[in-house]
Amino acid sequence: MEERNRIERPEYLQTLKQYRDMPLVKILAGIRRCGKSTILEMFKEELIRSGISEDHIISLRYTSEELEEGMSSKEMYRGIKRLMRDKDRYYLLLDEVQEVTGWEKAINSLLEDANTDIYVTGSNSKLMSGEISDYLTGRYISIPVYTLSFSEYLRFKEGDSRSKKELLQDYIRMGGFPIVARSNFEERSAYQIVEGIYNSVINSDITRRYKIVNLDLFQRVVKFVVENVGKTFSANAIAKFLKSEGRSLSIESIYNYLSYLEKAFVIYRCPRYDLQGKSVLKTQEKFYLADSSLKYCMMGFNPKSVASMLENLVYFELKRRGYEVYIGKNETKEIDFVAVRRDERIYVQVCRNLPEDSDRELTNLLELKDHYPKYVVTLDDLAGGNVNGVKLVHMADFLISQEY
């Protein structure tokens, strides 16, 4: 990436610096093209600035294109060891390691018999296969990487004279993939780029890995999930949808397909939390898309779908900040998000516009009798102020707020 088009992502760099030189493998995991490789490049520059000699930083990329004939864990181990010429510490920055069969074995050996500090990236479930628990139990930290936050998006657009609220409209429509954000693509071109990313994920990380034979049925399941972002649904609902189209798929296969999409970081599951019983419920979850542009590249932009994508933005902003995020169930009422981080908790309702009688929108929050922060987040330009302890906040302000 050209230097002038590259924006620092200090939150990720700070996390890597925090774990530097600890005897843990640092795993950066997220959907393809979300910026993991660039974060590694930036961290390499940070290491050099801190005084690490460049010849003690080993950067290797293991893409499927570069490993046409595959690579074994032994070949990976030997290849890295050959580059280590003394007993001083080496910093290993290894990109897309899941393309190496049994990469965990090689990494474990390098941890045990070499003076190393190891950082790896990956884009799919092969990164986190069952064998990682056999070889790296308690010896790795997983760092989720997401597409650009709105704050990061604004850094990409620093030369743009438009207001943050105007830029938010672009962010909603175009999403946060860095390759799109760093250039001024027209909408159609942006969606073509995102469609290419999506197809790469589906082909490389899902259909090929899991040997999906009936691609049409799989794509129909994906379509259902994308159309129902931010809505509770079940595998049975998907089965009924397929039946209405004259298709049939077992509940088990539907669960498998959803799992594959999760493991490729295309969708994220948001469970329900019973605020009365203080327990996580196992039914009627919601799913959110890794980036809003994934919906629009498949379905086209539809203003009617903006409300659900606003939820999508808030969900990932909370995830980026380290919250565990749930749908809140308070007897018969629903809270869009209950976000928990250590002993902190916040409640968030999301709506496109404030209704004339805003009490109706606030009711679900006002019925909560604890003293945790409560927000209604909206695109309404009149948002602002406080109603009985509930803060009314414009989406642009909520997404860039320093703290909640």
Stretch-by-stretch model annotation:
Residues S123-S125, S129-T232, F265-Y268:
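Interdomain motor-coupling "hinge/lid" segment immediately C-terminal to the ATP-binding subdomain
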Residues E3-D21:
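Pre-Walker A adenine-sensing motif
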Residues S59-D88:
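Short glycine-rich substrate-engagement loop in P-loop NTPases that contacts/grips substrate
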Residues G328-K329, R352-A396:
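Catalytic cores of nucleic-acid endonucleases
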Residues K36:
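Conserved lysine of the Walker
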Residues I39:
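Hydrophobic positions on the alpha1 helix immediately C-terminal to the Walker A/P-loop
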Residues F185-E344:
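Accessory nucleic acid-recognition modules appended to NTPase machines
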Residues L28:
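Hydrophobic anchor at the beta1->P-loop junction of P-loop NTPases
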